[in-house]
Amino acid sequence: MIDLAILIILSLCVLAGYYRGTIYAAINTGVTVLALLIALLMIPAAAGVIKHSDRLYKGMLYYFEGYEYVSATSVEQVHTPANAVSDGDLKTIVNNANMPIPMGDAVQKNIRRLAYQEKGIVTLGDYFNQTIVDVVINILSMFGIFVVLRLIMGWTLRIIDSSFEGFPVMNRYDAVFSCGIGFLHGVLLVYTLFLLVPVALTVVPRLETFLNESLLGGFFYHVNPLLHLIPMT
């Protein structure tokens, strides 16, 4: 099912590229890249709005339980001070937790540099919980900003295209280049959609079973460069 959905998205992007031509397809892909870059830069501002809403932020801290990831190794470790955990023990705890990407790496880095010390966060369980919530907020912020920007930019591009009665088309190999660019655009869009996978897995861990059964889904999740650009705090 996941593979089919991905193939449909890629096919639609290839067809759109073929129909619109190489120049339009290239500009359209560039617009998506630009929207992603702006969304990435605006994460701190957007996430800050959510974090300054005590009711919403505390609600998320309550809902996204990070303690259970620690208890997968030992319940007693939940209340262990983060600075008292060795690198080896921390690696074991994170491996046993089987956390969504990039939660595991984010937790390890935040604990090693005591990122939340100024907030009074001390225990291992609280570090897991806080990191998960912050990463989720950052992902949702980036995705939401991207969607809004992409819709506005796409609508603007359509108006420009209509005003000039379409962008020029290459005399030779236009179909080949336009389809290729359309495919790359589709890959980029799928990567963007898969930003939501860690959030979904945090809420419903059993979804990982369906993801592991998907060849394309597993690829776009495990080999997703966008996930590693998400801020850790």
Language model features with spans:
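Alpha-helical transmembrane segments and their juxtamembrane interface "caps"
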Residues: 1-233
